[in-house]
Amino acid sequence: VVLGRTLAVSLLGLAGHVIEVEAHLAASLPAFSLVGLPDASLAEARDRVRAAVTSSGLPWPNRRITVNLSPASLPKSGSGFDLAIAVATLAGAGLIDPAAARGVVHLGELGLDGRLRPVRGVLPAVAAAVAAGHRRVVVPAANAPEASLVPGAVVVGAHSLAQVAHAYGADIDAPDVVPVPSDHLDVARAAPDADLVDVLGQDEARMALEVAAAGGHHLLMVGPPGSGKTMLAARLPGLLPDLTEAEAVEVTAVHSIAGTFDPVGGLLRRPPFEDPHHTATPASIVGGGSGVPRPGAASRAHRGVLFMDEAPEFSTAVLQTLRQPLEHGELVIHRASGVARFPARFQLVLAANPCPCGRGVGKGLECTCRSEQRRRYFSKLSGPLLDRVDLQVDVLPVSRAALDPGSVAESSGIVAARVAAARAVQAERLAGTPWRTNAEVPGAWMRERLGPDRRLVSDLDRALDRGLLSLRGVDRVLRVAWTLADLAGRQGPRRDDIGQALLLRTRGQGLA
């Protein structure tokens, strides 16, 4: 009995599992069987592998071939197993050195001509292989720069199956081939090249944006068209600090699976920015798809900003899918074959008009909407969703005074410096805890540090008694108050900080 063995990696969400690929060749009627819980796309590998082997100048073994993907309990999908199946088959047939291929991880899709095509998710797959103790990895040449980002990985990039077989001792030539380029759908966007200095007026909205950046808070802006909501949202990523090394690896892994990562620039070190159209489906926001689940816009915005312009125009199903990541910081995709988890700890920015026609506030043309239309328009933004949004402000039309050439607004650099200082204070206060920003801190932890003086939170007590705030809303106001204190350089929030946080929570209404 001749066995060929090598390794591959199966991805489920961001979690990678090393798979042993075994090929058994028996002297029987020629056949090719693939076992070990492969899906339909992986079952097609039989024909691709056979065509690639013969196109590479190697003889196809005229025997009964059984390829096992172990452990069989793990689901396997996608074309990334092609190279490992081909190498195991050639090793079992004695066409290459079996010992050389054993213990090496092989990732890549095979074309019918034997060329290696790049696959998605190479970064988390290689990271999982290295974590399991398998440092040597063979990938398509187009994926080699991405695989090399994993510390400790010994990466070999190949253009064709013939090159891989030749390196393992096959008696064939390995001619140069035209490489298959990477197929990036749309390179992940970091902070847009925009500055707050371009935003005229809007002092309250600018302050809310600074507070959101400093504390990691979610933000709702309501205002007529042209008031600057989109401009403000696009400038939020520019106020956020760079990602840490661990965050950069995690964010890059998400975009690697999504196919939106260009490895030329290295790890993604700036917060990503996602702004899906209001016609987006729940699957495009949450993720999913056939075969290997792919992250949606919410996961691609991990450690960055998810901006939903014209939020009431999104379907109710889409808006309700946001509740899980807002509460838990991850998205869970349930399949019959397993559960895929993607991180989704983003800052949500919602923008909405005051009514369907958009002229509900300000001067000029009168609003043409009936009260029922207004109620139905905002009913999409449900109470449970808005209850999770810490900052809710009105963005009013800009006055003529804001257009005065002598009035100069602060730049993003100045505001970002204050944000960085506030984040440093939070990091010191939250050292030794699992939280990084005020927006993540539980209410009980904050209330303990306010002390027993109820006068400090008397405004919150009245708002709670009058039904203006839920208990979750009280905690959200306290989080914003701590952020205001951090921006001001104080050790803790004062009563005026809590009052201002309450105004920022209730679109300027406070206890009125």
Predicted segments with their positions:
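Peripheral, non-AAA+ core regions of ATP-driven protein-machinery
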Residues: 1-220, 224-227, 334, 492-512
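Short loop/turn elements that form and flank the Walker-type P-loop nucleotide-binding site
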Residues: 60-63, 100-101, 133, 151, ...
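Catalytic P-loop NTPase motifs of RecA-like helicase/translocase cores
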Residues: 113, 308-315, 358
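The Walker A (P-loop) glycine that initiates the GxxxxGKT/S ATP-binding motif of P-loop NTPases
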Residues: 223, 287, 310
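Walker B catalytic acidic pair
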Residues: 303, 309-310, 321
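Conserved alpha-helical scaffold flanking the Walker A/P-loop in AAA+ ATPase domains
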Residues: 210, 266, 271-272, 283-306, ...
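Basic, amphipathic alpha-helical bundle interface domains used for macromolecular binding and assembly
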Residues: 35-46, 59-61, 68-78, 293, ...
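Walker A/P-loop
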Residues: 221-262, 328
